Amino acid sequence: AGGVKKPTTLSMIVAAITAMKNRKGSSVQAIRKYILANNKGINTSHLGSAMKLAFAKGLKSGVLVRLKTSAGASGATGSFRVGKAPASPKKAKKAKSPKKKSSKKSKNKSNNAKAKKSPKKKADSN
């Protein structure tokens, strides 16, 4: 039962905000209405709680930004915009380079060990 993987609630919220193109941000009610209209098979009884969790996760990670006009609001209230995504590719490059260095060192050690063993064998044969 591989089926089609449904998008996450956060990705549906981001898609709704970008599609509405509202300069003053998009309200939670408008986002909910857009998601229900454009995504089939959404469980309406669980959408409210899923949206609350997605808004909290999006605000914490910086994917979503609450507008200054609704700064006093908490939870899934007020207006939201799409924030700037954090730059993660730089971290991936740094993680790859030390692994390459360690593999080079291990190759050199194995070559040195082989070179030391071969003269001993010649000495034994004499």
Curated annotation (Swiss-Prot):
Alphabetical UniProt keywords: Chromosome, Developmental protein, Differentiation, DNA condensation, DNA-binding, Nucleosome core, Nucleus, Spermatogenesis
Xref: SUPFAM superfamilies: Winged helix' DNA-binding domain
PTM field: OE2 and OE3 are produced by post-translational cleavage of a common precursor.
Biased composition range(s): Basic residues: 90-120
Tissue specificity field: Sperm.
Signal sequence, start to end: none
CDD domains assigned to the protein according to its UniProt record, in alphabetical order: H15
Gene Ontology MF terms in the entry: double-stranded DNA binding; nucleosomal DNA binding; structural constituent of chromatin
Functional note: Linker histones are implicated in chromatin remodeling and/or transcriptional regulation during spermiogenesis, the process of spermatid maturation into spermatozoa. Protamines substitute for histones in the chromatin of sperm during the haploid phase of spermatogenesis. They compact sperm DNA into a highly condensed, stable and inactive complex.
Protein name: Sperm-specific H1/protamine-like protein type 2
Originating organism: Ostrea edulis
